[in-house]
């Protein structure tokens, strides 16, 4: 399926993902993940982007974020990945691209955001890296469940009501919505109902065919 021009809308949550070049690992050790999040949080604040969920896997990253400007999302990942690539290549005495092209993203309506939050946080469980939902350090899941962590999250309650996060993570996922989320993120198209798609078309000036 062809990849559309990226659509970014200010004030709308987006699912964002990006892989290492040729699916190579982008993190070797905990220090690397610390450094990545240091850069990410610095530029998240600079470009005024809300952070709802995140997960760092060995060769890719996932986020649910909300930019305050159309340019803010691209700037956040441009500068985060530029600074992190410089750090990682210097450490490895390597050169070349660390990340695979541009990031993929999809604006989310409330139903798709509800699924995207746990889709992002449950990545390590699906990959078989952990056996308990609270056992992975490098995602927003642990902070949600324990209230402890240095990477501050924005409240999701403007869009979704989740009172018991652990119970929410254990709910059966809506596979149809997840399928849509994956497909629309890969092709940079919005994930939502007809009303939401029309809203994004109006905001972006783009037309989407499904």
Segments predicted by a language model, with ranges:
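Short Pro-Cys-Gly-centered "Cys-loop" motif that presents a nucleophilic cysteine in a tight turn
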Residues: 1-14, 18-53, 57, 66-210
């Amino acid at each position: 399926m062809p990849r559309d021009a990226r659509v970014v809308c200010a004030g709308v949550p987006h699912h964002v993902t990006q892989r290492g070049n040729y699916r190579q690992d982008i993190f070797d050790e905990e220090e690397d993940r610390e450094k990545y999040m240091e850069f990410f949080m610095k530029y998240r604040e600079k470009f005024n982007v809300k952070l709802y969920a995140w997960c760092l896997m060995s060769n890719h990253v996932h986020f649910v974020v909300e930019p305050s400007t159309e340019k803010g999302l691209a700037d956040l990942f441009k500068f985060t990945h530029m600074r992190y690539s410089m750090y990682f290549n210097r450490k490895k005495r390597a050169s070349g691209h660390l990340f695979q092209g541009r990031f993929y993203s999809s604006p989310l309506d409330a139903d798709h955001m509800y699924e995207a939050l746990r889709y992002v946080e449950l990545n390590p469980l699906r990959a078989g890296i952990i056996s308990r939902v609270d056992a992975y350090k490098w995602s927003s899941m642990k902070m949600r469940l324990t209230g402890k962590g240095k990477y501050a999250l924005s409240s999701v309650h403007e869009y979704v009501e989740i009172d018991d996060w652990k119970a929410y993570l254990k709910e059966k996922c809506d596979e149809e919505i997840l399928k849509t989320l994956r497909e629309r993120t890969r092709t940079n198209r919005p994930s939502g109902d007809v009303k939401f798609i029309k809203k994004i078309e109006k905001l972006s000036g783009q037309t989407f065919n499904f």
